Structures are given as structure tokens and as C-alpha cells.
Amino acid sequence: MEETNNSSEKGFLLLGFSDQPQLERFLFAIILYFYVLSLLGNTALILVCCLDSRLHTPMYFFLSNLSCVDICFTTSVAPQLLVTMNKKDKTMSYGGCVAQLYVAMGLGSSECILLAVMAYDRYAAVCRPLRYIAIMHPRFCASLAGGAWLSGLITSLIQCSLTVQLPLCGHRTLDHIFCEVPVLIKLACVDTTFNEAELFVASVVFLIVPVLLILVSYGFITQAVLRIKSAAGRQKAFGTCSSHLVVVIIFYGTIIFMYLQPANRRSKNQGKFVSLFYTIVTPLLNPIIYTLRNKDVKGALRTLILGSAAGQSHKD
């Protein structure tokens, strides 16, 4: 997106759902509601994991990292989207678009890797229980989490830097809800074969490879769980892993639809709704799924709330 396009002066026109005013008003309320719940849910999950010593384990360390990524990821999109939907002028500044491009892609890529790391953690816990503490050493866990954040940053710098260099020849209308790499590549007025190939490679590395690793991990996990003699033990193991698997299917499925499916095979509105799903809906699902399906988290949350209430009444 070179400055000769005047994009840096005029910004980009985000059409979103402006051609359907009633739908846009409805989505505004839904997105605002989901965003607030996502912030509250993920923040509560981070606080519980930090404040309750019983949750100072690798699983909850990665879960708190996931919640942190989700808060940042949805915040990189939702506020701008709400502002744009609530005003007549749908223009987004050039700098805002570029910043959103880098941040959203970096955080989304980090979450892709982090979910695979969490699958490995579950594999180690279920299939290597006697060596679990030795395998998932705190330094190793920190390295895995740091690697997930760093890998997202690196791929974002590479992919987005290539994208912003594309000449747009004055084109500044984005028929989408926010600035995203596939949409900006389509706006370019030159051959984008290299950019599309690079995006495809990045998508394979950050989507297909993690999904395959997760499936392999859960294959071993399923075998190990079926060998557990205790019905209660099997139920607990399946409950923990199924929660993670639900998040994985929803998150990867929607992003694969957006990034690996040819654009001519989906309608413009399909792409918009799919983008809403992995930027707004999925970050809300994580705290709900992990809280409602996890007795440890529910117990810790209950203790935290009751403790705060007791402390407040004692002061009074």
C-alpha cells in the first residue's frame, strides 16, 4: 500500500454490512455484548489462574496465556468495528488499518501455535503422567508460551510487510469488516502470485501443521484414556480434553475457511461472518467452555468470589 495510492491520506472505506442497516444495528448490539462478556470472562480466568495456588500448573499457565491472547486479539478488532458500524463515515485511517493488520495477524497466529502447545500439554498429562512434572518444567512451559507469542510476531511482520508494499492504484474500498491480509491482497492492482503463495505457506505452517499435531496428540490421548480402568478417571480426562477440542475445531475451522479456501468459492458476506466468528465469538467461548466444564476453575472462582465477599463484609 504505497503512498502514491493516496491511501495514507484518505484511509480505507470499510463497507462491512452498511448495505443492510437493520442487520448492522443488530450485529452492533451482539458484538458489543460478546466483546464485554469476552473481556470479563477472560480477565476473570486470568485472575483465578494467578491468584489460586491450586491452579499454578502448566495447563492453567497456558490457559491464562490463551485468555491474554484472546483479550488482545478481540480488542484489536472489536472497538474499531463498533465505532465504524456506529457512524456514517465508514473510513478507517491508513495508520489504523496497518496497525490492525499487524496486531490482529500476530495475535491470531500466536493463538494457533498456543492451542497446539496446549494439546501437547494434555498429551503429556494423560499419556506420560509419571514424567509429566519433569517434562512440563516451568522453564520449558515459559519457552513454549514465549515461542508461540514470538512466532506470531515474526509471521505478522513478514506477511504484513509484504502486503503493505503492494500498490493499490487508488483503490481504497474494502468490502470487509476490518483490515485483513486476504482482503488487502485482493485490492492490489499488480500480480499478487508471490503474496498469495507466501500467505498459503504461512497458513499451512500456522493452521494445517498445528491441526495435524493436535489430532496426533488426541489420537494418543484417546488410546490412553480408554485404558483407564476408573470410569470417573476416564470421564475427567475426556471432559478436560473435549473442552480443548471444541475450541480447536471452532477456531481453526473458521480461519481455514477464510485463509485456505479460494475467495471465489465463498460469498462476501460469508467471509465477513466467518471473520466475526474467530475474532469475536471464539474469544468468548474459551472462558465459558473452560469454566463450565472444569470443576477446578469453578471451585477456584467460587472461592475467589466468596473470599472477596467475606472480606468486604468484614470491613463493613
UniProtKB/Swiss-Prot annotation:
Listed InterPro entries: GPCR_Rhodpsn, GPCR_Rhodpsn_7TM, Olfact_rcpt
The protein's role, per its UniProt record: Odorant receptor.
Name used for this protein in its record: Olfactory receptor 2G6
Transmembrane segments: 26-49, 58-79, 101-120, 140-158, 196-219, 237-259, 273-292
PANTHER family referenced in this protein's UniProt entry, alphabetically: OLFACTORY RECEPTOR (PTHR26453)
Protein source organism: Homo sapiens
Extracellular topological intervals: 1-25, 80-100, 159-195, 260-272
Keywords: Cell membrane, Disulfide bond, G-protein coupled receptor, Glycoprotein, Membrane, Olfaction, Receptor, Sensory transduction, Transducer, Transmembrane, Transmembrane helix
Pfam families recorded: 7tm_4
Encoding gene (name): OR2G6
GO terms assigned for molecular function: G protein-coupled receptor activity; olfactory receptor activity
Cysteines engaged in disulfide bonds, as pairs: C97-C189
